């Protein structure tokens, strides 16, 4: 966006995290919905994740359940621990587009992230709100390692780095050998943005 302000035209590819289980989304109601993250093996590193929703009126409550059965209510204000050696950092910020984003980091005892499932339960008294989650892990190939187990990942709405500029021309990977059944490549972002803006 900064270079666009200087008159430079940007044409960039759009990545996709859904087909490799690094992006998932679902509607959250007052009864609560969970995002389940799977860590396939105990290794050094951390879970790095972000969750985003439209607007700033969602006011969620988020509870983390770790593989050892400990639960902790996120405060969105920095560091916490579950009492069993797992450390958590969480923070809630407003984005430039007026949405809210929850950033979450989970660290294991002595830097070793514990194998198993980490469940994040979102609840809110606000109207039904669509919550999106993105994540990355510290090891493995792009399509391996830490991933969402639920909700089911989806290619829709995934417009990822480097295709994240508001003003760039964003290009998808598109296949159409005979023009009878065109499709996006699974590694390509498809959009739209979570606010419905068409970006690809």
Task: Identify the meaning behind each predicted range.
Residues 1, 13-14, 121-125:
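Short acidic, glycine-rich surface-loop motifs adjacent to enzyme active sites
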Residues 4:
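Anion (oxyanion) recognition and catalysis
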Residues 7, 20-114, 122-123, 148-200:
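Extracellular S/T/G-rich loop segment that most often corresponds to the catalytic His/Ser-adjacent loop
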Residues 11-15, 171-172:
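Active-site neighborhood of phospho(di)ester-bond hydrolases with catalytic His/Asp-centered motifs
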Residues 127-140:
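Edge beta-strands of jelly-roll/beta-sandwich modules across compartments, strongly enriched
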Residues 138-150:
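A short "linker-to-beta-strand initiation" element
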